[in-house]
Swiss-Prot record:
This is Cytochrome b6-f complex subunit 4. Keywords: Chloroplast, Electron transport, Membrane, Photosynthesis, Plastid, Thylakoid, Transmembrane, Transmembrane helix, Transport. It comes from Chlamydomonas reinhardtii (Chlamydomonas smithii). Component of the cytochrome b6-f complex, which mediates electron transfer between photosystem II (PSII) and photosystem I (PSI), cyclic electron flow around PSI, and state transitions. Its main location: plastid. Belongs to the cytochrome b family. PetD subfamily. GO terms for biological process: photosynthetic electron transport chain. Pfam families: Cytochrom_B_C. It is found in: Plastid, Chloroplast thylakoid membrane. PROSITE patterns: CYTB_CTER.
Length: 160
């Protein structure tokens, strides 16, 4: 047996919410059994089919065998460490580089306290957090791309 909450359209508070485009979660169809028995298995099986299909259609190519006696000219880390690698490579003082890396999560922790005066959930109404996110993403991509270039053109990406 499922229980659904029928909307009481004579309620002035609900009418005001619906007029503003809010209040759509106050009623509707139940999660059991509709979502849990019908939608989730379809999503799980669809994701599984996509992964299997991609692995069959485009298998990963094997690289050349490793040679322990030949060291490459420049060793690069995995792609997700590129921005951190670039910070350590560009900053002359290694302690300053480590402090800059520690400043990133410390700065992210302070964002909710800076935005605490703003009560909106909409990211378009939280300009400080949105600007910090966009700026941080841009800097991380810039540093990540720059870490693949030689050290003399890594900050300018060879553009300037």
């Amino acid at each position: 047996m499922s229980v659904t909450k029928k909307p009481d359209l004579s309620d002035p508070v609900l009418k005001a919410k619906l007029a503003k485009g809010m209040g759509h979660n106050t009623y509707g169809e139940p999660a059991w059994p509709n979502d849990l028995l019908y939608m989730f298995p379809v999503v799980i099986l669809g994701t599984f089919a996509c992964v299997i299909g991609l692995s069959v259609l485009d298998p990963a190519a094997m690289g050349e065998p490793a040679n322990p006696f030949a060291t490459p000219l420049e060793i690069l880390p995995e792609w997700y460490f590129y921005p951190v690698f670039q910070i350590l490579r560009v900053v002359p003082n290694k302690l300053l580089g480590v402090l800059l890396m520690a400043a990133v999560p410390a700065g992210l922790i302070t964002v909710p306290f800076i935005e605490s005066i703003n009560k909106f959930q909409n990211p378009y109404r939280r300009p400080i957090a949105t600007i910090l996110f966009l700026l941080g993403t841009l800097v991380a991509v810039w540093l990540g791309i720059g870490s693949t270039f030689p050290i003399d053109i890594s900050l300018t990406l060879g553009l300037f």
